[in-house]
């Protein structure tokens, strides 16, 4: 670590003025030397005219070791406040005293810096380059501010600007050499210097305050409103002009220019002069007050975005397409989801809600190693290592137990041990199927006649019915007479029950006989053959092909069909005319029609008349007085009953106390009866159990006696059978005959 610290160096400015060094014993006389020097420099700069002597009059300081007070910002490198304050001073004042004094002080410090023997780091070299650029930029700004009238009156041409820019590097080179020599002589004081990043004058921008920014925004809004009004007026004129009137088309700009907006403009801080002065406050009185609002969080860097020179109206894929969630699913998720008020808050959220203790971030000057988070992102290794795999294989080998078989003696005898070869079976000989159905099909085909019988036509005499009456034309149906009905216009939707008149009688089904066959052809009945179901291969393809062929064949036959030849009928006999009699229809008789409304009206009038008569009769009956029969005379008169009082009550005039029964006594009696019944039941159960026990004991005794009897061996007596009677045989005795083995006597 010691080597690292020796090689590492950080040129950071100090954020404070070390006034402790001014209180040394040797510097007691020169306490105000720094302030005097600053005043002298300002007087010299004010006394001189032009910008030529601005940087020439560099007076050495009274004491080389004197601590220089350099006003620096809070941030070490990227300090926006210093830039803003410097730019405001350059714009407002012609000659900024603070800038000149700081430059001279830096120049004086850089002269006395000795050459550094250590190797310059990349960071130091970059910082020094920035310092040199900033110095040159400040010089240019001072020149511009010193002569504002000349710059406004006479603007240099492009060629002059280019020539001036070409000369600048030469001056910069000489300035770089001087500063490098001066910086090398004072390594200690270089640490106290402030490095400010420089920007080229072309890219330099004047920062505006928040009020100016708000004014600009309001101006832009007003301009947009004016443009919108103009467009609306044009549209109004176009609408009023109509379709036929020629209207001047407004030229719309294709490219839409958008101003550059930097995030750093919104981070402008107030000038220290404009800030409120420090006020002494009583500490104890401020304890109970509410804390101030949390410190303002610093915004990040400006995010670079592409320039939208022309905006399209087409919506993107993300805007149009969104995952569809049905309403039922949303309702189900809502019921399943626990509300946030029931969740416990984490401690991290509470920490974030608390206000930060330190508003000003502390800058650490010591080098620190970066806190890399990659080691925490390492995932757990899921695959097994070789050592684990070998250990698992070893466990499997140990678990497996090998059991040896007996030695086969044939191995020692010699010769290969081969399994017995199975006997080779002969190949299967195919045998054709002799099906009965094939036989029947062959027999049927042989029975079928190859050619149909030749049919000859023989004419027959003409039937006489044709001459007598019309043949083949059906009789005309006699339609029923139309019955007129009153139209019920007011009762269209009323459904009426069908009346008997409306119900049509079901006509009997006419059984038609089959047509008479042709008498010229002799009738030969065909006896249906006794057939069985034929098993045919099931295939849609063959059936469809066959149907298609039949269809094509039928179409061809219809197309090639010959035109039918005309054949005249024989002439009838004109001697006698046998025409059918002409049927004369009866004339339609006019009948008066009866409307439904008339019938309903008559019925209603009749019912209304009956109701009126009934009401009048009831009113007359109510008006006539009719007395009810007198039943009081026949009833018995009312006789009050005398109250029966006891003798004691009558004498003393007091009531005798009747006997009473307490509910406790009644319950006690009921309880005694219940206990008595329970005792009887218990005694009965005990008696039954005792009887069952005695019966079981008797059964066991009987079983033991039976077993003892069966176990004792007792011989069975000799059985007596019926005597056997021997009868003599009736057959004669066998006569012995010698066998004839010789073949001499055979013929």
Curated annotation (Swiss-Prot):
<dbReference type="GO" id="GO:0072686">
    <property type="term" value="C:mitotic spindle"/>
</dbReference>
<dbReference type="GO" id="GO:0006915">
    <property type="term" value="P:apoptotic process"/>
</dbReference>
<dbReference type="GO" id="GO:0051301">
    <property type="term" value="P:cell division"/>
</dbReference>
<dbReference type="GO" id="GO:0019901">
    <property type="term" value="F:protein kinase binding"/>
</dbReference>
<dbReference type="InterPro" id="IPR027330">
    <property type="entry name" value="TPX2_central_dom"/>
</dbReference>
<keyword id="KW-0832">Ubl conjugation</keyword>
<feature type="modified residue" description="Phosphoserine">
    <location>
        <position position="359"/>
    </location>
</feature>
<dbReference type="GO" id="GO:0061676">
    <property type="term" value="F:importin-alpha family protein binding"/>
</dbReference>
<feature type="modified residue" description="Phosphoserine">
    <location>
        <position position="292"/>
    </location>
</feature>
<dbReference type="GO" id="GO:0005829">
    <property type="term" value="C:cytosol"/>
</dbReference>
<feature type="cross-link" description="Glycyl lysine isopeptide (Lys-Gly) (interchain with G-Cter in SUMO2)">
    <location>
        <position position="740"/>
    </location>
</feature>
<feature type="compositionally biased region" description="Basic and acidic residues">
    <location>
        <begin position="167"/>
        <end position="181"/>
    </location>
</feature>
<feature type="modified residue" description="N6-acetyllysine">
    <location>
        <position position="305"/>
    </location>
</feature>
<dbReference type="Pfam" id="PF09041">
    <property type="entry name" value="Aurora-A_bind"/>
</dbReference>
<feature type="modified residue" description="N6-acetyllysine">
    <location>
        <position position="375"/>
    </location>
</feature>
<comment type="similarity">
    <text>Belongs to the TPX2 family.</text>
</comment>
<feature type="modified residue" description="Phosphoserine">
    <location>
        <position position="125"/>
    </location>
</feature>
<feature type="modified residue" description="Phosphoserine">
    <location>
        <position position="121"/>
    </location>
</feature>
<keyword id="KW-1017">Isopeptide bond</keyword>
<dbReference type="Pfam" id="PF06886">
    <property type="entry name" value="TPX2"/>
</dbReference>
<dbReference type="Pfam" id="PF12214">
    <property type="entry name" value="TPX2_importin"/>
</dbReference>
<dbReference type="GO" id="GO:0060236">
    <property type="term" value="P:regulation of mitotic spindle organization"/>
</dbReference>
<feature type="cross-link" description="Glycyl lysine isopeptide (Lys-Gly) (interchain with G-Cter in SUMO2)">
    <location>
        <position position="641"/>
    </location>
</feature>
<keyword id="KW-0053">Apoptosis</keyword>
<dbReference type="GO" id="GO:0005819">
    <property type="term" value="C:spindle"/>
</dbReference>
<dbReference type="GO" id="GO:0007026">
    <property type="term" value="P:negative regulation of microtubule depolymerization"/>
</dbReference>
<feature type="modified residue" description="Phosphoserine">
    <location>
        <position position="310"/>
    </location>
</feature>
<dbReference type="GO" id="GO:0005874">
    <property type="term" value="C:microtubule"/>
</dbReference>
<feature type="cross-link" description="Glycyl lysine isopeptide (Lys-Gly) (interchain with G-Cter in SUMO2)">
    <location>
        <position position="500"/>
    </location>
</feature>
<comment type="function">
    <text>Spindle assembly factor required for normal assembly of mitotic spindles. Required for normal assembly of microtubules during apoptosis. Required for chromatin and/or kinetochore dependent microtubule nucleation. Mediates AURKA localization to spindle microtubules. Activates AURKA by promoting its autophosphorylation at 'Thr-288' and protects this residue against dephosphorylation. TPX2 is inactivated upon binding to importin-alpha.</text>
</comment>
<keyword id="KW-0007">Acetylation</keyword>
<feature type="modified residue" description="Phosphoserine">
    <location>
        <position position="293"/>
    </location>
</feature>
<keyword id="KW-0963">Cytoplasm</keyword>
<protein>
    <recommendedName>
        <fullName>Targeting protein for Xklp2</fullName>
    </recommendedName>
</protein>
<keyword id="KW-0597">Phosphoprotein</keyword>
<feature type="region of interest" description="Disordered">
    <location>
        <begin position="110"/>
        <end position="143"/>
    </location>
</feature>
<comment type="subunit">
    <text>Interacts with AURKA. Interacts with importin-alpha; leading to inactivate TPX2. Interacts with HNRNPU; this interaction recruits HNRNPU to spindle microtubules (MTs). Interacts with BCL2L10. Interacts with KIF11.</text>
</comment>
<dbReference type="GO" id="GO:0000922">
    <property type="term" value="C:spindle pole"/>
</dbReference>
<dbReference type="InterPro" id="IPR027329">
    <property type="entry name" value="TPX2_C"/>
</dbReference>
<feature type="modified residue" description="Phosphothreonine">
    <location>
        <position position="59"/>
    </location>
</feature>
<keyword id="KW-0131">Cell cycle</keyword>
<dbReference type="InterPro" id="IPR015128">
    <property type="entry name" value="Aurora-A-bd"/>
</dbReference>
């Amino acid at each position: 670590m010691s080597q690292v610290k020796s090689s590492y160096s950080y040129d950071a400015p100090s954020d404070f003025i070390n006034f402790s060094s001014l209180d040394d014993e040797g510097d007691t006389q020169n306490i105000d030397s720094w302030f005097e020097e600053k005043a002298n420099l300002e007087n010299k700069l004010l006394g001189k005219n032009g910008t030529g002597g601005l940087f020439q009059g560099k007076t050495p300081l009274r004491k080389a070791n004197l601590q220089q007070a350099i006003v620096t910002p809070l941030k070490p490198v990227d300090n926006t406040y210093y830039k803003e304050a410097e730019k405001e001073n350059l714009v407002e004042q012609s000659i900024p005293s603070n800038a000149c004094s700081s430059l001279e002080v830096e120049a004086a410090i850089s002269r006395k810096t000795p050459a550094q023997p250590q190797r310059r780091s990349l960071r130091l070299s970059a910082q020094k380059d920035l310092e040199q650029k900033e110095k040159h930029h400040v010089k240019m700004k001072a020149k511009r501010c010193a002569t504002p009238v000349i710059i406004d009156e006479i603007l240099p041409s492009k060629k002059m600007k280019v020539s001036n820019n070409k000369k600048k590097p030469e001056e910069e080179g000489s300035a770089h050499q001087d500063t490098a020599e001066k910086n090398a002589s004072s390594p200690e004081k270089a640490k106290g210097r402030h490095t400010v990043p420089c920007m080229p004058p072309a890219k330099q921008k004047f920062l505006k305050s928040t009020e100016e920014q708000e004014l600009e925004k309001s101006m832009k809004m007003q301009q947009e409103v004016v443009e919108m009004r103009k467009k609306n007026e044009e549209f109004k004129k176009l609408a009023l002009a109509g379709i036929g009137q020629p209207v001047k088309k407004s030229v719309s700009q294709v490219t839409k220019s958008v101003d550059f907006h930097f995030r750093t403009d919104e981070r402008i801080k107030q000038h220290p002069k404009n800030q409120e002065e420090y006020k002494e406050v009583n500490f104890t009185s401020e304890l109970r007050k509410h804390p101030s609002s949390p410190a303002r969080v610093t915004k990040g860097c400006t995010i670079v975005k592409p320039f939208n020179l022309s905006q399209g109206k087409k919506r993107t894929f993300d805007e149009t397409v969104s995952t569809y969630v049905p309403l039922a699913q949303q309702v189900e998720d809502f019921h399943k989801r626990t509300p946030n008020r029931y969740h416990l808050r984490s401690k991290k959220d509470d920490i974030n809600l608390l206000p930060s203790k330190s508003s000003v971030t502390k800058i650490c000057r010591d080098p620190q190693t970066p806190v890399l988070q990659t080691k925490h992102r390492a995932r757990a290794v899921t695959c097994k290592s070789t050592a684990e795999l070998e250990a698992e294989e070893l466990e499997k080998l140990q678990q497996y137990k090998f059991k040896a078989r007996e030695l086969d003696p044939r191995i020692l005898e010699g010769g290969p041990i081969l399994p017995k070869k199975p006997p080779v079976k002969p190949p299967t000989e195919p045998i054709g199927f002799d099906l009965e159905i094939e036989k029947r099909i062959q027999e049927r085909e042989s029975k079928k006649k190859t050619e149909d019988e030749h049919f000859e036509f023989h004419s027959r005499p003409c039937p006489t019915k044709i001459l007598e009456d019309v043949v083949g034309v059906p009789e005309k149906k006699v339609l029923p007479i139309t019955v007129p009905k009153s139209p019920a216009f007011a009762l269209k939707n009323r459904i009426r029950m069908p009346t008997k008149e409306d119900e049509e009688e079901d006509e009997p089904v006419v059984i038609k006989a089959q047509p008479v066959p042709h008498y010229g052809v002799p009738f030969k009945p065909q006896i249906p053959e006794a057939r069985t179901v034929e098993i045919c291969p099931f295939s849609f393809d063959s059936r469809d092909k066959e149907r298609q062929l039949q269809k094509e064949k039928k179409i061809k036959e219809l197309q090639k069909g010959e035109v039918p030849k005309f054949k005249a009928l024989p002439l009838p006999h004109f001697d006698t005319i046998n025409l059918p009699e002409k049927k004369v229809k009866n004339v339609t008789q006019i009948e008066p029609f009866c409307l439904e409304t008339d019938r309903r009206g008559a019925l209603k009038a009749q019912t209304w008349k009956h109701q009126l008569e009934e009401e009048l009769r009831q009113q007359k009956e109510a008006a006539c007085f009719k007395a009810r029969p007198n039943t009081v005379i026949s009833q018995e008169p009312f006789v009050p009953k005398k109250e029966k009082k006891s003798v004691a009550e009558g004498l003393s005039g007091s009531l005798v106390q009747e006997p009473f029964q307490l509910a406790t006594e009644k319950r006690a009696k009921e309880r005694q009866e219940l206990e008595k019944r329970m005792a009887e039941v218990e005694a009965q159960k005990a008696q039954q159990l005792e009887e069952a026990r005695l019966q079981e004991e008797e059964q066991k005794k009987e079983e033991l006696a039976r077993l003892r009897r069966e176990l004792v061996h007792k011989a069975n007596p000799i059985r007596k059978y019926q005597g056997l009677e021997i009868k003599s045989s009736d057959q004669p005795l066998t006569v012995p005959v010698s066998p004839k083995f010789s073949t001499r006597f055979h013929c």
